[in-house]
A protein has these predicted regions:
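Alpha-helical transmembrane segments and their helix-start/interface "positive-inside/aromatic belt" motifs
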Residues: 1-14, 80-94, 171-176
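Membrane-interfacial interhelical loops
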Residues: 21-52, 85-144, 162-165, 191-221
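Hydrophobic cores of alpha-helical transmembrane segments in multi-pass inner/ER membrane proteins
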Residues: 55-68, 141-156
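Cytoplasmic juxtamembrane interface segments
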Residues: 63-91, 161-162, 251-256
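Cytosolic-side transmembrane helix boundary signature
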Residues: 72-75, 146-177
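Hydrophobic core of alpha-helical transmembrane segments in multi-pass integral membrane proteins
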Residues: 93-97, 144-154, 177-187
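Internal/C-terminal transmembrane anchor helices
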Residues: 168-194
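Soluble catalytic regions of membrane-associated enzymes that act on cell-envelope
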Residues: 193-279
């Protein structure tokens, strides 16, 4: 039981620290804009940003937690668990590092943290890349590789914590109960605490300086949150069938033609009256 709990707690704490590391990195990246901020403001960026960092760490810990919970009842060797965790950490490190690097590069041009606004540009990558220079690309590429490697190296020791120990039925129930309790804390972290409102970007805003509020925002949470809200289908806005739409537009067109005809007729009458009124 203990190795499972240790691995999840360690993953959460390490991820939280790595998410918090983005704040001073962002402030250094845009040092010219952070130069006027006081020391308390800079500390506030990290402190207030911990809320969304904690939520993001909770999201990342969910899958390993579920794997550990399932392994209580389905026999899983240490080698298999280690391999699954390595694959998961590699994929997540790639995705997180990519989001962080792209966000860091685009903020200079967009002046807000990465969100679903970027999705339409991904459909036309050639056009989007046409305006990118090596001055923009090289630093973000270095950041992507460096931060991604840091994430994976920090997470990798967790893959060796799990131990496939044979347990009695009572021990399995005890372990399951402990894992479910731990899952409750993860859920609270994802939700952003016990407040009425769940975690959202505005919860980390603490300053009249919008740059500092943006610096406190977690780009991974910002992107996932906005992307989930923007997943609306065309059918969500369709109140009429195609046939009904055609009839409505046809009626509008006919009314418009009649209005144009009447306008022309009245214009001719006014012109005639003006002509006759001339001495």
């Amino acid at each position: 039981m203990l190795p499972r709990i240790i691995s999840i707690v360690a993953l959460y704490v390490i991820t939280l620290l790595l998410m918090a590391l983005q704040k001073p990195l962002f402030l250094m990246w845009y040092a010219e804009r952070a130069a006027d901020a006081s020391a308390s403001d800079l500390i506030g960026v990290v402190w207030h940003g911990l809320l969304l960092d904690s939520t993001t760490a909770g999201y990342i810990a969910v899958v390993p937690w579920l794997m550990m919970l399932i392994s209580v009842w389905i026999k899983t060797s240490e080698r298999v668990m280690e391999r699954m965790l390595k694959i998961y950490f590699a994929v997540i490190a790639f995705i997180v590092a990519l989001i962080v690097a792209v966000d860091m590069g685009l903020f200079r041009h967009w002046d807000f943290r990465l969100d679903s606004t970027i999705i339409p540009y991904l459909r036309t990558p050639k056009e989007a890349a046409a305006s990118v220079t090596w001055g923009d690309l090289l630093p973000t590429l270095i950041l992507f590789c460096g931060y991604g490697a840091l994430l994976y190296v920090a997470w990798r020791p967790i893959t060796k914590v799990y131990k496939a120990v044979k347990q009695s039925l009572a021990q399995r129930f005890t372990t399951t109960l402990a894992m479910i309790l731990l899952g409750g804390f993860i859920f609270l972290a994802i939700r952003g605490g016990v407040d009425t409102a769940p975690a959202n970007v505005s919860k980390v805003y603490f300053s009249d300086n919008m740059f500092l509020n943006q610096a406190a925002t977690n780009p991974i949470f910002s992107f996932i949150s906005s992307a989930s809200r923007s997943e609306l289908k065309d059918s969500d806005y369709r109140y009429y069938s195609d046939e009904e739409c055609a009839e409505i537009f046809s009626a509008i067109s006919e009314d418009k033609e009649m209005a144009n005809t009447e306008s022309v007729s009245w214009a001719m009458v006014l012109a005639m009256m003006t002509f006759l009124a001339r001495p």
